[in-house]
């Protein structure tokens, strides 16, 4: 467990120790009507909103990193979700990385979060609000067992499941990434109400947070949506494949060279940075 905690901490702070990308040199949102441009892993945003860091329903972590920008739809989603959580007495929603002022590529920790439509949310709901020191150096709560096959019962709660379900039932949400063991527990607990599980997708890591992704806004004409998740609740063979040992000869994919930026994003960089 100690090794896992260290790995989680390293994941959350790694980006601070790497060289800045050009996008990190843009310190304020680019003026203009809100437009998400490109794909989630290769894009930018014009006219981003700033998530207010003061709220009765949520708290923003690591504000010193200035990653609390996004499309207005994302800001409204966070406010909507945290209000629903507050109404149900679930606790305070802890907001992690959204995007940078103009979106774009991070120097580490994320491949996506580039178009202002992604947010990481901790899977813990404190009843007592965190101090500023806790928010600046958050301690992730690893919900998954060391072998990765199930959640830790003492750390899992119906409130966490309710938070994920609330997010999945939001019309603007297209995907929620969680660890396969968390998805498995949601499948076990869901009962007959299962339509929302389609949006909850198993993915590597994501042991302590969920990564919520919104659909492209209708008026963001240069935004590239992902295909919809496959039909069904995703609780069958696809999910079980995540728990199978790697096939012999399987190797990690080579690191790919980033693709060219969408022209509008390159023009934005040319004007504001280069």
From Swiss-Prot:
Taxonomic superkingdom: Bacteria
Binding site for Zn(2+) 2: 147, 150
Cross-referenced InterPro entries: Hedgehog_sig/DD-Pept_Zn-bd_sf (IPR009045), Peptidase_M74 (IPR005073)
CC annotations in GO: outer membrane-bounded periplasmic space
EC number(s) on file: 3.4.24.-
Subcellular location: Periplasm
Family stated for the protein in its record: Belongs to the peptidase M74 family.
Protein's name according to its UniProt entry: Penicillin-insensitive murein endopeptidase
Organism placement in taxonomy: Bacteria, Pseudomonadati, Pseudomonadota, Gammaproteobacteria, Enterobacterales
Gene symbol of the encoding locus: mepA
